[in-house]
Amino acid sequence: MIFEGNLGVRFMTIVMQIGCLVVTWFTINKSLRTIQTTYLFFIVSFASVMFSAYGFITTPDAPLLFFTALFLFGYKEYVESKNLTTSFILIIAATGLVYSKYQGLLVIVLVILSNLKLLKNTRFWVIAITTLILITPHLYWQYANEFPSIKYHVLARATAFKWGFVFEYLPNQLATFNPFVIGAAVFVMYRYKATEPFEKALYYIIIGFIAFFGVTTIRGHVEPHWTVAATIPMILILVNKSTTDTKLATYIKKYIGSSIILLLIARIIICTTLLPERIQFHSKQQKYLATQEIAGTRPVIYSGSFQNPSLYPFFTGKNSTVISSLMSRITQFDLWKFQQQFQTKKAFIAMHVDGKSNTYTSKSGMKIEGFYVDSLQTTDHIRFNFDVKNILFSKAKTVEMELSITNSSNHEFIMDHRELPARIEVVWINKKDIICTPCIITRPFASIKAHQSIKTAIQFVVPDVNLENYKLGVSLSSIFGPSMNSEFVTIETK
């Protein structure tokens, strides 16, 4: 980092926000860049709630917004003059979009859909192929890790349909963009038909983002900020049309401008301790320093949340990781296999476990819950393989199944570990509904040596549920919960 501490983390976010504003400004036609337009541009930009927030909140949305602005700038120039410079800008922007967030791919697709004539242009294909080459390392990483992002977004996040997901979507979008901003954008798109390819692309991105994520509410909760990339085209169409529509210009000054007062109040509140501790932007350091005081030189192991093991080393400079389970989301810590470096090492487990955890008080008086272990053992490196093709499942039936177990780590795995024992469970998953069934190991084993594979068998009773809706997997369960140790397969029922 260029700077230490919070500024070091947020510095590039600030730079990208400034860059995003500059690039967006230069996307406006030169003849329209007047003092009046400048005034309206900054009103709309500052009043766009999440766009403004990502000027100081460091997330992948900051580069997403920057590269969206750069891509639209490049596309506008490309439409007007297909030269080498605009092609280079589009290649850099498209690559940056994909690496920032997968929503960036939607920006690219919607622009192409708005102008299918691009598909007949040789230079377009040169840009597309070059971009594909630049993102090949990421595609290979996805392949090497069994496409974790796709599995997470397509499968893991899917839940049963709830009307609540649908009904919350529109209010969340109003909060994301500012009701006055999105309302004006909808009015402009309804009132003025897009007549040029670039303007058409702006309309497609706005409508496409809101429609696409609106449809995805049928499979689960949609985070409000997932549509934030549509802010850039909203700013552009409002500022562009305000130069010829005096009523729109007045509306921007009077209503969108007035809403900035509420945003300023919100920013002031953020600077205080009035918000719940979980979402405060400061005062977090004390908790992690207190945890480090209790943990000493031992790495701190968290469960479930990726925020804690990220913030702990940031504030203390000490090691930390998270142990995920089927009850929580897969994190970057899992993909990087952070847990492996702490296997068999002393550690402090910062979580509540009945009969194990204690409450410790730091010198500052802060209470920290957790317990010490002298030899950490996790279950994420154990892999189960099984075949259910010849098994017919029915409710309450006792099933015996062959099981192949592989230990991919450099350390022996002990089932009856003195501090962190594990047990095999059969797991039934129906979207977010998870049922764990205990099983009997009919050919018992005490441990699995490093890089060893063994064969055994388990016996379990099928749960009394509608089996057609569930997939079956096998998991190792510990104090951290059932871990992801196998594929989940469809079963045959009678």
Model-derived features with residue positions:
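Transmembrane-helix motifs of polytopic, lipid-linked glycan transferases
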Residues: 11-32, 70
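Transmembrane-helix signature of polytopic, membrane-embedded enzymes
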Residues: 24-47, 65-66
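Membrane-interface transmembrane helices that cradle and orient dolichyl/undecaprenyl
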Residues: 30-35, 71-86, 194
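Membrane-interface alpha helices of multi-pass inner-membrane proteins
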Residues: 85-101, 131-133, 213
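Hydrophobic, aromatic-rich transmembrane alpha-helices
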Residues: 116, 175-196
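Membrane-proximal, lumen/periplasm-facing interface regions of secretory-pathway glyco-
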Residues: 250-297, 305-322, 326-327, 350-353
